[in-house]
Amino acid sequence: MRDFKTYLSVAPVLSTLWFGALAGLLIEINRFFPDALTFPFFSF
């Protein structure tokens, strides 16, 4: 039961860090390529 309580306290912290980093990455991509429906580095 102790391990389960540890998991319940670690998972929200890790998910908050992950989603915060993902949001920051999306914000930076949107800053360099504003309103881009297709990104220039993905077009072939």
Swiss-Prot record:
<dbReference type="Pfam" id="PF01701">
    <property type="entry name" value="PSI_PsaJ"/>
</dbReference>
<keyword id="KW-0472">Membrane</keyword>
<comment type="similarity">
    <text>Belongs to the PsaJ family.</text>
</comment>
<keyword id="KW-0812">Transmembrane</keyword>
<protein>
    <recommendedName>
        <fullName>Photosystem I reaction center subunit IX</fullName>
    </recommendedName>
</protein>
<feature type="transmembrane region" description="Helical">
    <location>
        <begin position="7"/>
        <end position="27"/>
    </location>
</feature>
<dbReference type="GO" id="GO:0009522">
    <property type="term" value="C:photosystem I"/>
</dbReference>
<keyword id="KW-0602">Photosynthesis</keyword>
<keyword id="KW-1133">Transmembrane helix</keyword>
<keyword id="KW-0603">Photosystem I</keyword>
<dbReference type="InterPro" id="IPR002615">
    <property type="entry name" value="PSI_PsaJ"/>
</dbReference>
<dbReference type="GO" id="GO:0015979">
    <property type="term" value="P:photosynthesis"/>
</dbReference>
<keyword id="KW-0150">Chloroplast</keyword>
<comment type="function">
    <text>May help in the organization of the PsaE and PsaF subunits.</text>
</comment>
<keyword id="KW-0934">Plastid</keyword>
<keyword id="KW-0793">Thylakoid</keyword>
<dbReference type="InterPro" id="IPR036062">
    <property type="entry name" value="PSI_PsaJ_sf"/>
</dbReference>
<dbReference type="GO" id="GO:0009535">
    <property type="term" value="C:chloroplast thylakoid membrane"/>
</dbReference>
